[in-house]
Amino acid sequence: MNKELVILKISGASLKGKNDIIDLDFLREIGRQIKVLSNNYKVAIVLGGGNIWRGNIAKEIGMQRYKADQMGMLATVMNSLALQSLLTNINVKSRIFSTIEMEKIADSYIIRNLEESLNNNEIAILSCGTGRPYFTTDTGVAVSAAELGASYIMMGKNNVDGVYDSDPNKNPNAKFYKHLTYSKAIELGLEVMDITAATICKQSNIKTIVFKMNEKNGILNAFENKSKFTLVSEDEKDLDAFKFGIKNIKNNSEKSSNNWDNKVIDIKTIKEENSLNIDDIFENSIEELQKLKEDDIQKNQKKLNEIIKSFYQDNKE
């Protein structure tokens, strides 16, 4: 089955430890979740550099903006090297790509090389943003998502679980948005991403999931609908379609009872009692499900039940 591409944006601020530039426990937690996510998706990672370099320091010492931005780009390379080392230690293959030439450290950001790496089930770690000053890492994420045809951008935030109309840590009455269009976010000036990045995502029909990064299983919980998050896209119906993701089908199947009409078949029971390759069943079933209307959740679940039931009964006989 052809895997969809997900680009995960991790802010530098979320990486920072109390006394060190990187919280190693948090980095290990990220690596573990990336490994799980890569079983079902192609994964590219973009790391910020805010744990190492902040723009306010540049202002205090009178540094020119372009030099400050270049330091920020180099900080993303340092974080990328740390993440790559951790992934290697847990047997996850990865490659670092840089939009600035540094051949002894990273591969050049060339689309065909990136696509080859992703197709070989490697994690692509993207560093240096767009490679140009005056552009944020958010814009770099959006450009990469558009160039590579990503389905989702996962925008991990520090200490906030989605998009609000004001800072929820300061305003207990802040309004939370479960779904938001890029147009509305730009109009209201909400801090989802910068205007350039939002415009690129809007034009390229890329969906963005904004979630709380610094909590256990933050990435997986957001992608499996087990935690609070905001989905940003141009169609509100995307929220229903997202709720019926592939991983969600599998999770629901493992938890439900064996009732063909109303519930999804209990996969664990079948797997224990028979020698069927359940993973193959799901792969074939999901390909058929993707041909159906994504917004008709109940119909899709019923169809999945019928496919698995038929396969199960044929093999049991």
From Swiss-Prot:
GO terms for biological process: 'de novo' CTP biosynthetic process; UDP biosynthetic process. GO terms for cellular component: cytoplasm. ATP binds at K9, I10, S11, G12, G50, R54, N158, Y164, D167. It is found in: Cytoplasm. Pfam families: AA_kinase (PF00696). Pathway: Pyrimidine metabolism; CTP biosynthesis via de novo pathway; UDP from UMP (UMPK route): step 1/1. The keyword Cytoplasm applies. Its EC number is 2.7.4.22. Keywords: ATP-binding, Cytoplasm, Kinase, Nucleotide-binding, Pyrimidine biosynthesis, Transferase. CDD domains: AAK_UMPK-PyrH-Ec (cd04254). It is an enzyme of class 2 (transferase). It catalyses: UMP + ATP = UDP + ADP. Belongs to the UMP kinase family. This is Uridylate kinase. It comes from Malacoplasma penetrans (strain HF-2).
